[in-house]
Amino acid sequence: MIGKKFSSIAVVILAVGWSASYALAEDAAPDQDKIAAGETVYNTRCAVCHGDELVNSGQTFDLRRLKADERPRFDNSVRNGKNQMPPWKGVLSDDEIDQLWHYIRVHAFQK
């Protein structure tokens, strides 16, 4: 009796754990549409200063160094500008900034 109860509990725990890990994997999967749209935004608005490879030989911030937890910093810099970078608030939509973030994060991870 105890063995059956233990087996049932183990199956439930495994099922819940598997479901949660599958859901996390789904959430973590890169959104290819956002990445492609972000590439367009980057190439038309950012590459001229930040370079084709997210870095411009010390002239601008090396975007490859952005960490996943720096999203608020990124959003603030893009919207309000920083140092020599002009503000893009009113030029780029929230969706474009989000797309840009996804593009940079995927490519920064690969560098």
Outline where the language-model segments fall.
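Residue-level detector of conserved, well-ordered beta-strand and adjacent loop positions
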Residues: 64, 86-89
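Gly/Gly-Pro-rich "capping" loops immediately C-terminal to redox-active cysteine motifs
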Residues: 32-39, 51-82
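C-terminal capping alpha-helices of c-type cytochrome domains
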Residues: 78, 90-111
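Residue-level detector of flexible, active-site-proximal loop/helix-junction positions
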Residues: 23, 70, 92
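N-terminal export/targeting leaders of redox proteins
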Residues: 1-32, 111
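Short cysteine clusters
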Residues: 46-49
